[in-house]
Amino acid sequence: MSSRPHPGSERPLHGPRQRFDLGTVVGRLMEEGAWQRGQRNSITLRKGEGMNVVLLVMKAGDRLEEHAALAPLSLSVREGRIRFVAEEEIVEAESDTLLTCDAGVRHTVVALSDAVCLLTIAG
């Protein structure tokens, strides 16, 4: 496993302490080509040592097809609105909402508006 997020990056993926200015990181994601072409974009902020953290920006209507994580997860909606469907339960979540689910729970995420989410996966 690499300790860097992208080839040539100076930012380590884990360490004893890390700090992120999420507003700045979101701004960078929205400047990148994927977002400009109407696609979702993401960056792994931390990976390893028992915790993976991904910042995700989604366009309205974007969808993460049904899948399951191998470990428990939390999804914090920072901006916008999403629909989270897990095991027949539908939850519409907006800014300042935290959702969690256990390992192996199949789920789908749909952006109801442009959205910013912070995904944390244990393990």
Model-derived features: where do they sit?
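Ligand-binding loop in jelly-roll beta-barrel domains
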Residues: 92, 103-123
